């Protein structure tokens, strides 16, 4: 093998190995971020005090207003329930039987949320929007 071809081959091998190592490091670090939220039935698998997202349906008759900006409510995945405490402004779509994602920490079996995200279906229309009437109807 000629010296120039040998140097090119070594350079290609080094670049390939570097790329494999780089992708491996990125995937290893992103592993925890791939799951968007944890359902209440899997909450026992998460360590206490670690920030995470939990998601489920707001259980009917579970919303309790503690103060003007403090509430507690229960979410469920129809397997297990989880009580959530939240202080702040509620999303406009927050209501019973609605899907939500709460971001916060688990502490002594209670979830303390710092942010709530209300989920909606693919037919969502923001409040105060008018659906234009179709011609001829």
Curated annotation (Swiss-Prot):
It holds the Pfam family CcmE. The keyword Cell inner membrane applies. Residues 1-8 are cytoplasmic. Residues 30-137 are periplasmic. This is Cytochrome c-type biogenesis protein CcmE. Keywords: Cell inner membrane, Cell membrane, Cytochrome c-type biogenesis, Heme, Iron, Membrane, Metal-binding, Signal-anchor, Transmembrane, Transmembrane helix. One of its GO terms (cellular component) is plasma membrane. Belongs to the CcmE/CycJ family. Heme chaperone required for the biogenesis of c-type cytochromes. Transiently binds heme delivered by CcmC and transfers the heme to apo-cytochromes in a process facilitated by CcmF and CcmH. One of its GO terms (molecular function) is heme binding. It is found in: Cell inner membrane. GO terms for biological process: cytochrome complex assembly. The chain crosses the membrane at residues 9-29. It is a single-pass type II membrane protein. Gene3D superfamilies: Nucleic acid-binding proteins. Heme binds at residues 120, 124. It comes from Rickettsia bellii (strain OSU 85-389).
